[in-house]
């Protein structure tokens, strides 16, 4: 229906082993290209990825990526679509990352929807004593959680456990748009 002839998989260039492995695997499929990406923020946003991978800019709204011939999917969504189309499997589980500097066993877990985040934290070695904040999602767009009994849902991607030092708020300073953050 979409008449797709080319697919790109973007991987940050600080992951050379992943890039090499994916390039080897991609040779078995016509029209798939692995694109090493600069490690920078923001890079994972839809518009930024389109610009970095195919050098097209999505105009201001109401324009959307399809207007420049692009569709962007994250790995979890792409995998869910594959399983639905190829295996007739409904979406009832996700891969969820549990990570953080103090986590004993940072891991990716294939997790059923509804599983409490607390169970994943236990599977990764338990709640570190120095935990200052628990974030559902990632460090930039995730949400701080006051309760780890929150269930995994289709939008869950990770649990980030920040230690006390990381969780402390830096003194507010005026933004001069230096891009250091």
At which residue positions do the language-model features occur?
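Cysteine-centered iron-sulfur cluster-binding motifs in ferredoxin-type domains/subunits
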Residues: 169-181
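N-terminal and secondary-structure boundary signal
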Residues: 1-3
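Short acidic beta-strand-loop surface patches of small beta-rich interaction domains
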Residues: 12, 102, 132-150
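Short polybasic amphipathic segments
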Residues: 94-98, 132-134, 157-159
